[in-house]
């Protein structure tokens, strides 16, 4: 696995804490410095826009689609995952919040994964160290793109 990380993706834990703390109580639109909402204007749905906004606008990372973990934090390769949190759909749920939808860790290609050892696989490298960023998804139903700007 390649471990060449772009300089914009290298952080200390304190830097990550400071950047994410600064985003608390703000909408995705308010933190969208990369203007991703404007870029996708007119589209009903853009899969992964919340994660892209956190990665590009809050953390300031340059866009990439590499199969390796997203950032390096204090020398540790770390996968960044962003997911919306909602009130539970079931009235008798013991939970205060639940994920809006299932979260994908990585795309699995059968011809590739069968030739990998688990301990050195892209899947394991992503799973080993994960940073979860949650945002409050106010609507009980899926909204169009402009609905994220609450």
Regions found by a protein language model. Give the residues of each.
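Nucleic-acid endonuclease domains
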Residues: 1-76, 82-150
């Amino acid at each position: 696995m390649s471990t060449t990380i772009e300089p914009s993706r290298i952080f200390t834990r304190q830097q990550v804490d400071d950047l994410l703390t600064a985003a608390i109580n703000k909408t995705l639109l308010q933190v969208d410095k990369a203007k991703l909402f404007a870029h996708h204007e007119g589209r009903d749905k853009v899969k992964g826009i919340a994660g892209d906004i956190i990665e590009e606008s809050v953390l300031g990372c340059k866009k990439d689609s590499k199969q390796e973990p997203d950032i390096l934090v204090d020398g540790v390769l770390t996968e960044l995952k962003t997911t919306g949190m909602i009130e539970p759909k079931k009235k008798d749920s013991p939970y205060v919040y639940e994920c809006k939808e299932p979260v994908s860790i990585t795309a699995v290609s059968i011809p590739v994964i069968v030739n990998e050892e688990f301990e050195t696989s892209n899947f394991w490298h992503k799973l080993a160290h994960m940073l979860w960023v949650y945002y409050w998804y106010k609507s009980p139903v899926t909204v169009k793109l402009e609905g994220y700007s609450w």
